[in-house]
Every structure is written in structure tokens, then in C-alpha cells.
């Protein structure tokens, strides 16, 4: 007999899924005044971290800052629930500095659930969405497993790895989402019927082990940064920060690798059971051992999952090998001899859309009013998901209410770069944001995300009064200090005394503070020792000012390089060009260029995995070849 549908509600925007993408989409849409509902299979899985218990990292930390600058929630949640904070890549230039925190999984979920509950105009429903309703090429609503029908002007799909989810551990497999959630199979069929081009991707996660079973005396300790140096993600966070836990590093060894290789055919990855494509930049431990056969060891980062749990996460050791093999190879590692696995490592295969079927607004070209975000769009990572969620939710709300939609250009943000890569190049494997993907990375730093994006967030209605006031206050402090540095002259004697006191060779002459700050050996704190700290200037703002002044010339040069690349787009590439000899290219670019053999630079730049900086390297090599 035909199902009788019960009409249960009318909304402007419906969001399917309440993971990292769904949270930001629902929050953004409701904040813009759209009547919004978010559907999740379980209220207890809102903001769940089924993989690493951390936020941020290289390029990802910048995405979180950008999200925050636009009015998102992730930065505030990370600041409220972190256990340990570290600034990565501090020994490198400011373009790649990256904030990363260990978070308390349970507290993060609780924070996010409460944040959604406190969002005005947002309804939260625990129900599985089994289908979308489409009429004349436009989405009209959703249907739930309980025969509930909800109409909507726009729908955002943020299903994570639940869509057609299938978990593999050795030769055992079962239909499932992450962390024991059930798979969303009916929705896959509905989306296929609507004409969406779906494909299969795969990801994996390591085992969770019991703290008491680890001998930490055999591991390297990895403390967080000194409390005095800790920085928040959110531009709104003012509270002092303190590290609460330590992380640790263990290493695989030749015996670990032997056990893995002896059992490699028992991995569903190598036994042909998994058809989905895995993430290039987050390989399983068996992938690492096979692909990097010359390496004697690989690091495994041992990270706590929370303050009130004994579960430890083994970052860098994801696997889909059977449990007996997992026990054997983990126990071959120093410090893990008596390891107790609480949750085995597994691989998960899932359905996602070909992102070239999306507009730059993240709206589907196939079904109007339907938006995609997160792993559904072919990306990997909480931060990539959250950033897309905000953009999709914002645009869904604007569309539902008849407003113009937001397209972020590459030069504005990592989020703009990510979306442009997705919809222009497409993806062959789960996409991870990296600094090398942006040709504007000197200007797209984590410290100036507010300057780049908060005015845009304000214009589109996401940035509320408190954030706008804080932003304007920060800008006025920075402008006043730039003026002061431009107008203040340091006497040679004062400067030399300050340099001597700092243990530096006092070779510099005095001069205008701004000009002196361009010199590599002179820092803002050193100058401030002579002329005093500017009013309202914190160590974070001082670092930002110093970067902008020191790197002004490099930024101008980078802009010229980008223009040169554009001019050379019609340059032909010889058919016999040896990409393997071009060490400036990333390994991924070399592989894909060799495989596809593009005819010209323009074609090369459109190949997934070939970044604009790879194109620049190629352009230089072709120019050199032409001259020789």
C-alpha cells in the first residue's frame, strides 16, 4: 500500500545533517533570518568528531579563522573546548603559520548542540531524511523515515560519510555511518533519481586505545606552546588560555612494517573490496608502508580524546586491516607492547557528489535550490566542511529570501580557493586544503582573516553587532599604530642600546620606526622597548603588523608573478617534457601531469591537484627550456 505522508512543517531552509558542515549551514541560515530546520539521525551526534579530536592545522587553521571572521561557530567552539594548543610551522614564514588545538570530543559536541539550541529561528529534528522532493527542476522539500513531509525553498545536503556508508575491517564489512550511526541509503537513491552525479569515496580512522595500556616512558612527549604564547581561533575570544594535557609521539619500526606487508592482502584496500577513492594526503598505515617502502619508521601521534575519558587517538595510524593484524602491528611499536584497542581502526566508503556539478555558490546545477557542503562535495576534514557549510547555508538563506548570493573569489580567502578548486577542477580523491593550493597565501594569512572577510560577513547579514564592534575597534588600533610607526623616529643610540640588550649586533642606524621594522633582525617588541607599545597592541596584533610591514615587497612580487602566469597560459608544453625532473612541483602534480600530458599551461592549470604555484614553476621551466 502507498505510504500516507504527514505534512509537518514549512521552512525557508532545511539542512540535512548536523556535523561540522550542517552546524554552520543551519546557524548561518537562521542568523540571516531564514526559517530553518536541521535534521540529524541523532541529537547525540551533533558536532561529533568521528576521526581526530582536533581542530585546525596547516591551512585548516586559516579556514577556521576565516569562518570565525564571517560569523561562524567553529572557532568559538574550539576555544571553549580545547585541551592543548600549538602554533605549527613557527620556524617558517607567516604565510604557513597554523593554529591547531586538541579538543575534548564530548565537550565540543555539547557546545555545538547548545549553540544550535540557542539559535533563534532554528528548529532541530531527530529524524532520518530518506528523500528530497523535486518539482520542475527545483527542490520542494524533504521526506523522513517516519513519513514526515517538510516543505522548503532551499535544502542543504551535509551528510558527511553517512550517505551510503559502508565500514570495512579486514574482510568484514557492514552498512554503517561513523561511530555506530546507521547508513543513509534511501537518500542516496533519491539523489540519484533526481539526477545528481554521485561517486564513491573512502576515508579511514585509527584505533582508539586505553591510556593505561601505553608505556609513556618509551614515547616522546609533545607539549603545547607556553601559556603566554597561546592564541585563540576566534577574534571574539579574550579569555586567558592554558594548556591542560600533553600529547605524545610513538614510531613504527621494520617489524611493524613486516607484519603489515605480510598481511597486506587481508586489507580490503588491497583485496579489491573497497571501490571508493581514498584521501591522498591522509593515507592509511598500510598505504604508507607500501608507498614509502624506503622509510624505516613513521610517526604516530598519541592524543587524548577528552578530559573525562581514557580513550587515546593514534593519529597517523588509520587502517582497515583485520583486528588480529591491528593488535599485532600496534603491539610491535615501542610503548604499545600491551596496547588495549577500545575501538578498532576501520575504513568507511560513502557517496558524494561530483563538485563540478555545483555553482560557485555551492548550489546544484541539476536541482535548483539544492546546496551541497562538506564531504558530500568531495572534501575531507572538519574545517573544510564547516567553511563550506557556512557558505552553503548563507546562500540558501539569501536565495530563499530573494537576495543576491555570495561568491568568494580565490584572492579573498582559502574558502574561496577551496570552492573554486572544487567547482572548476573537480576532485579525483577527497580534497584537503593546503597552503600550496593558494597563489595568494602571503595575503591570505590566519592573522588577517577578519580584515579580509568580516566586512563581507557584515554586508551579507552574518556578522552581528558585537563582532562588528570588535572588528572596528581592532582596525582603529592597527591604523593608529601604523601611523605612529610611520611618524616616529628612533635615535641611533637608543636603537643600538636596545639591540645590544637583546643580544643582537648593534649595526643599524636609527630612522623611521616603520622602515626599521622592515629589517629581518628588528622585531616589533624590540622597537617597542624604545618607543613603547602602541595603545591596545597585543602580542598577536604586534605580530600581524610586523608581518604586513616586513612582507610588503614580497606580496607585491607575488602579485606580479600571478599576472605573469596568466600571460603564459597559452604557452605550449612539448609532448616529451619530463615532469619528473622538475623538483619544484608537488609529487601529486608530477604524477597527474605525467599521466594526462596537457598540451598547454592553461590545460595544466585545470588538472585536479595541479596548483597555481605548480603552474608558475612549470612556466619558469618552459621559459628556461626555450632559451637553451
Protein language model features and the residues they cover:
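An anion/pyrophosphate-binding glycine-rich loop and adjacent beta-alpha core
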Residues: 42-44, 60, 87, 188-327, ...
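Conserved N-terminal/central alpha/beta ligand/cofactor-binding core
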Residues: 25-135, 146, 158-175, 182-187, ...
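Core beta-strand elements of the Rossmann-like FAD/NAD(P) dinucleotide-binding domain
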Residues: 9, 145-154
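Glycine-/small-residue-rich beta->alpha transition segments that form the dinucleotide
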Residues: 154, 159-163, 321, 334
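Extended, charge-enriched "interface" segments that sit outside catalytic cores
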Residues: 437, 443-445, 449, 454-616, ...
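Internal hydrophobic alpha-helix adjacent to the cofactor/substrate pocket in enzyme cavities
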Residues: 385-406
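Beta1/beta-strand and adjacent pyrophosphate-binding region of the FAD-binding site
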Residues: 7-21
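A glycine-rich dinucleotide-binding beta-alpha-beta segment and adjacent secondary-structure elements
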Residues: 313-379, 407-420, 538-592, 597
Amino acid at each position: 500500500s502507498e505510504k500516507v505522508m504527514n505534512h509537518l512543517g514549512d521552512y525557508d531552509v532545511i539542512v540535512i545533517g548536523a556535523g561540522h558542515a550542517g552546524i554552520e549551514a543551519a546557524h548561518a541560515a537562521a542568523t540571516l533570518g531564514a526559517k530553518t530546520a536541521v535534521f540529524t539521525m541523532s541529537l547525540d551526534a551533533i558536532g561529533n568528531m568521528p576521526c581526530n579530536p582536533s581542530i585546525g592545522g596547516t591551512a585548516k587553521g586559516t579556514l577556521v579563522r576565516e569562518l570565525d571572521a564571517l560569523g561562524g561557530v567553529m572557532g568559538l567552539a574550539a576555544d571553549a573546548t580545547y585541551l592543548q594548543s600549538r602554533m605549527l610551522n613557527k620556524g617558517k614564514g607567516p604565510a604557513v603559520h597554523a593554529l591547531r588545538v586538541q579538543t575534548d570530543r564530548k565537550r565540543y559536541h555539547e557546545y555545538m548542540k547548545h549553540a544550535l539550541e540557542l539559535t533563534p529561528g532554528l528548529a532541530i529534528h531527530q529524524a532520518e531524511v530518506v528523500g528530497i522532493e523535486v518539482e520542475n527542476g527545483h527542490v520542494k522539500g524533504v521526506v523522513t523515515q517516519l513519513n514526515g513531509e517538510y516543505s522548503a525553498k532551499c535544502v542543504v545536503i551535509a551528510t558527511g560519510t553517512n550517505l551510503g556508508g559502508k565500514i570495512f575491517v579486514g574482510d568484514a564489512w557492514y552498512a554503517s555511518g561513523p561511530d555506530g550511526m546507521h547508513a543513509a541509503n534511501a537518500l542516496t537513491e533519491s539523489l540519484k533519481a533526481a539526477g545528481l552525479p554521485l561517486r564513491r569515496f573512502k576515508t579511514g580512522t585509527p584505533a582508539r586505545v586505553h591510556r593505561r595500556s601505553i608505556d609513556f616512558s618509551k614515547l616522546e612527549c609533545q607539549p603545547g606552546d607556553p601559556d603566554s604564547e597561546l592564541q585563540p581561533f576566534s577574534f571574539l575570544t579574550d579569555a586567558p588560555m592554558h594548556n591542560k594535557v600533553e600529547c605524545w609521539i610513538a614510531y613504527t619500526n621494520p617489524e611493524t612494517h613486516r607484519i603489515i606487508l605480510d598481511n597486506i592482502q587481508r586489507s580490503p584496500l588491497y583485496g579489491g573490496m573497497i571501490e571508493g577513492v581514498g584521501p591522498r594526503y591522509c593515507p592509511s598505515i598500510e598505504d604508507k608502508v607500501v608507498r614509502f617502502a624506503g622509510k624505516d619508521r613513521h610517526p604516530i601521534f598519541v592524543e587524548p580524546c577528552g578530559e573525562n575519558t581514557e580513550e587515546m587517538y593514534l593519529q597517523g595510524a588509520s587502517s582497515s586491516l583485520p583486528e588480529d593484524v591491528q593488535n599485532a602491528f600496534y603491539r610491535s611499536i615501542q610503548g604499545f607492547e600491551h596496547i588495549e584497542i577500545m575501538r578498532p581502526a576501520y575504513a568507511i566508503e560513502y557517496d558524494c557528489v561530483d563538485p563540478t556539478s555545483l555553482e560557485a555558490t555551492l548550489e546544484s546545477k541539476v536541482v535548483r535550490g539544492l546546496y551541497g557542503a562538506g564531504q558530500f562535495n568531495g572534501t575531507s576534514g572538519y574545517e573544510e566542511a564547516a567553511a563550506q557549510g557556512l557558505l552553503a547555508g548563507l546562500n540558501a538563506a539569501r536565495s530563499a529570501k530573494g537576495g543576491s548570493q555570495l561568491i568568494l573569489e580565490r584572492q579573498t580567502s582559502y574558502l574561496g580557493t577551496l570552492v573554486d578548486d572544487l567547482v572548476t577542477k573537480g576532485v579525483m580523491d577527497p580534497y584537503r586544503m593546503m597552503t600550496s593550493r593558494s597563489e595568494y597565501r602571503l595575503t591570505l594569512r590566519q592573522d588577517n582573516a577578519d580584515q579580509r572577510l568580516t566586512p563581507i560577513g557584515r554586508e551579507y547579514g552574518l556578522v552581528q553587532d558585537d563582532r562588528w564592534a570588535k572588528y572596528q575597534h581592532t582596525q582603529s588600533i592597527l591604523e593608529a599604530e601604523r601611523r605612529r610607526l610611520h611618524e616616529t623616529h628612533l635615535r641611533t643610540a637608543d636603537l643600538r642600546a636596545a639591540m645590544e640588550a637583546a643580544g643582537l649586533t648593534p649595526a643599524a642606524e636609527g630612522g623611521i620606526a616603520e622602515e626599521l621594522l622592515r629589517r629581518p633582525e628588528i622585531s616589533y617588541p624590540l622597537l617597542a622597548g624604545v618607543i613603547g607599545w602602541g595603545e591596545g597592541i597585543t602580542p598577536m596584533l604586534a605580530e600581524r603588523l610586523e608581518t604586513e610591514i616586513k612582507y610588503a615587497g614580497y606580496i607585491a612580487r607575488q602579485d606580479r608573478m600571478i599576472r605573469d602566469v596568466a600571460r603564459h597560459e597559452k604557452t605550449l608544453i612539448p609532448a616529451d617534457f619530463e615532469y619528473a625532473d622538475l623538483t619544484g612541483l608537488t609529487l601529486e602534480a608530477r604524477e597527474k601531469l605525467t599521466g594526462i600530458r596537457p598540451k598547454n599551461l592553461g590545460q595544466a592549470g585545470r588538472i585536479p591537484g595541479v596548483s597555481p604555484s605548480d603552474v608558475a614553476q612549470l612556466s619558469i621551466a618552459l621559459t628556461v627550456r626555450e632559451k637553451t
